[in-house]
């Protein structure tokens, strides 16, 4: 929870037709998975300019964000995995029928900028890369982190990697690589690519890859459901889809 990053991004003019001014447009509070951060941050200024809304973000691992919601955190829009959205609907915290798939993203590998890129094209090569690394960085939270932990067990090297792991419950694990504290980092590709000083080697081999779907939903107690819906619709526009693709994701 400590590593969940909060950020507010500002700008704007007006959302609703006619004479609604920027001064009257409501803030929209968004709790979003780190996986969509690189794309959304780039899209925010234009959305705010067109609508007059200010977007106020809390970024983090999906499961940690849900814990915040279950603890009473107020929000207008939440962007996490479909299963978590479904549970929030059951709890009455997300409007039933408001869920929209926004993006699909895979897990990748990153190294420090300028460092030799290891072979990760096959499962055996990836396994050897992990064994050769002096330190491996990965997250212990979120669907991608849990998937990687499962991969380590499947490959039979969980204990070897755990002994030299650099882990965090949330945030950008590629920072360990950028600072020279780990040789490789494993996380969702957009999260890796967003860290200065690192290079994405590529995705995990197909046999052990997983794709995380990120879904947006509107809070039952959202301050401005119309504004929340406008944001979700904006993230499905051609302009937004273009940015999502450019950040290494597939549109939902």
Indicate where each model-derived feature is located.
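Dinucleotide-binding Rossmann-like beta1-alpha1 core, especially the glycine-rich loop
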Residues: 75
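Sec-dependent signal peptide recognition
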Residues: 2-10
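Alpha-helical transmembrane segments and their juxtamembrane interfaces
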Residues: 12-13, 86
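Exported/periplasmic ABC-transporter solute-binding proteins
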Residues: 23-63, 67-71, 79-92, 96, ...
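C-terminal segment of classical bacterial N-terminal signal peptides
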Residues: 14-22
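Serine/proline-rich low-complexity intrinsically disordered segments, especially terminal tails, linkers
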Residues: 8-9, 16, 34
């Amino acid at each position: 929870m400590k590593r969940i990053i909060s950020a507010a991004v500002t700008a704007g003019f007006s959302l609703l037709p006619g004479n609604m001014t920027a001064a009257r447009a409501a803030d929209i509070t968004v709790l979003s998975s780190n996986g969509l951060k690189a794309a959304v941050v780039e899209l925010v200024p234009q959305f705010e300019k067109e609508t007059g809304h200010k977007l106020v973000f809390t970024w983090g691992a999906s499961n940690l964000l849900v814990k915040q919601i279950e603890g009473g955190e107020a929000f207008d829009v939440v962007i996490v995995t479909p299963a978590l959205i479904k549970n929030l609907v059951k709890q009455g915290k997300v409007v039933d029928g408001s869920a929209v798939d926004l993006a699909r993203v895979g897990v990748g590998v990153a190294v420090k900028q300028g460092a030799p890129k290891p072979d990760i094209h096959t499962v055996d090569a990836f396994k050897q890369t992990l064994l050769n690394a002096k330190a491996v960085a990965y997250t212990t939270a979120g669907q991608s982190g849990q998937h990687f932990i499962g991969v380590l067990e499947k490959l039979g090297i969980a204990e070897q990697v755990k002994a030299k792991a650099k882990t965090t419950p949330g945030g950008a694990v590629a920072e360990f690589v950028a600072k020279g504290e780990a040789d490789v980092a494993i996380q969702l590709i957009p999260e890796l690519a967003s860290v200065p000083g690192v290079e994405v080697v590529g995705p995990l081999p197909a046999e052990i890859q997983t794709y995380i779907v990120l879904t947006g939903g509107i809070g039952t107690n959202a301050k401005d459901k119309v504004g929340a819906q406008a944001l979700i619709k904006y993230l499905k526009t051609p302009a937004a889809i273009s940015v999502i693709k450019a950040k290494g994701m597939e549109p939902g």
